[in-house]
Amino acid sequence: MAAGLFGLSARRLLAAAATRGLPAARVRWESSFSRTVVAPSAVAGKRPPEPTTQWQEDPEPEDENLYEKNPDSHGYDKDPVLDVWNMRLVFFFGVSIILVLGSTFVAYLPDYRMKEWSRREAERLVKYREANGLPIMESNCFDPSKIELPEDE
């Protein structure tokens, strides 16, 4: 009885898949216990004819795995010898040239915002004022006799 119910439910499943347009597997199953045969019924419908277009191989395969041919590939070239040399060149120029010469360039950049110059200039003025007996700092930044004020009206 259970085998008969299984055969009936399998036929219903195949028929439902065929009516909804789902691909139904063309399976024929035979039970070894009850000798019940489950096969797709005629209700499942016929498959639509397959397209008649000719299959053509892609002239340039996009998903070629370079690691199958060269397990030590660095991703620069398909040829293993060129791949190693390209990797060496990239690392030589990337590390040696850019890091070494780049850090040398940054080290010799001019004084940023003239901090060092302003410090040296202040020290020079302090030494000059101490040597001539002048006060180190004055209350007036500008000479008051040289400032021209507008007349009061």
UniProtKB/Swiss-Prot annotation:
From the record, give the transmembrane residue ranges: 89-109
- KW Electron transport (keyword) present: yes
List, alphabetically, the Pfam families matched: ESSS (PF10183)
Q: Where is the composition biased (Basic and acidic residues)?
A: 66-77
The stretch annotated as transit peptide is 1-29
- List localization entries: Mitochondrion inner membrane
Q: Cellular component per GO?
A: mitochondrial inner membrane; respiratory chain complex I
Which parts of the sequence are annotated with region: Disordered?
Answer: 40-77
Tell me the keywords, alphabetical order: Electron transport, Membrane, Mitochondrion, Mitochondrion inner membrane, Respiratory chain, Transit peptide, Transmembrane, Transmembrane helix, Transport
- Tell me, how does this one assemble? Complex I is composed of 45 different subunits. Interacts with BCAP31.
Name the chain's protein.
NADH dehydrogenase [ubiquinone] 1 beta subcomplex subunit 11, mitochondrial
